[in-house]
Amino acid sequence: MVSNLENACLSSHYVYCPGRVCLFGEHSDWAGGMRRFNPDIPVGRTIVCGTNVGIHARARTLPTMLTVQSTDETGGKYGPFSVPMEPAALLAKAQEGTFFSYAAGVAYHMLTHYRVGGLEIDNFETDLPLKKGLSSSAAFCVLVARAFDRVYNLRLTVRGEMECAFAGERLTPSKCGRMDQACANGNRPVVMTYDADFLAVEPISISEPLYLVLVDLRAEKSTVRILNALQGCYPVATTAEHRNVQHALGIGNLDITSRALAAMEAGDAQQLGAIMDESHALFTAAGSAVCPEELLAPVLQRVLTHPLIRPLVWGGKGVGAGGDGTAQFVCKSLAAQQELVRLVESELKMHPIPLTIEPSTTVRSAVVPVAGFASSLFPATKVVSPPLFPICDRDGVAKPAILIVVEELCAAGFDKIVLVLILTYKETYKETYRPKRDR
């Protein structure tokens, strides 16, 4: 007969990570990182927001293996793939360059930095388009890091998940920058600044909803070819074409992101759309000179200038690395967003993804009274305070009720949480929230 404790250990944890859309500043993340070799290069800056589509998975412990089964956006199944949870085996698998390599790279990092065992990940649903500039690979890396965190109760912060995911991805042949791990922040817009190895992440407060539509162009592009061409212009520019690329990703990008940030905070969608058009023109002019086969992007250009689309939008640009992957538009209204979705499906036979960036909440602090006694729970309350009653969470782990409440508040974006309690239970609450490393 299986005990309750064994059931809890065998239970799976639901894990989710969205994709991300870079509104402005593509490629400036790795370009800013080049300051390690050339301090004359300007810092990089991106404006990023999570998507409302992503990767869904269940995760549970395994003794000695990493096993992953994945599902793409069409419902196609891949795997399961398995590798021993050993450093040499994980590193070799990470360097192969397959989609499974991302999981192996992150697992290698987790194994060498934390006390973890094996893991089984069942990616049972994916509604995030793959290889379309929405950071599907980075989302998968964050998902794996998050799965280790949930299953082994590592208590990583969002920033910690991002760092683990990036470290794991860098063990693969991928040349993506740090921006992609912004998908760990959920659908909250953030501005990210890159100065060599330093990364700053700040949330953006907007006053009015912004109605966007992402369009999967259902065409082909090579991110590897684009990155090879653009990164060939660094760290020192040797030709006029190289200098134009460094300007577009440097000084030009800082100017565009500064004005875009101001427009977002003011809720000025019209100005934001105009800046998108300007940003697209700047990047295309510089990028297509060094990678014309990818960055001239005829499908993208046709969609951005489509006569049925332009009356509905304030502006638009490419997404991610660029090329014929995904387009994004700032719509004039909610009705325009809905009409654009219909038009893209019926007329262009492409896949639209509506994305609404809501105004930031003004409530950032929560006060939770935990000093009361529930008479209906007597005499159990003689032993433990009601907020400390054990409740089985959806991940199958029994936790104090107040811990579940605080986790939900943290997930909702509250910066400060105050518990009002009886002094008798002060030490109990301090022990509940004391970091594991201090125990």
Annotated model-derived regions:
Residues 86, 107-108, 113-132:
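Glycine- and acidic-rich phosphate- and metal-coordinating loops
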Residues 339-344, 430-438:
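Short, aromatic/basic amphipathic alpha-helical patches
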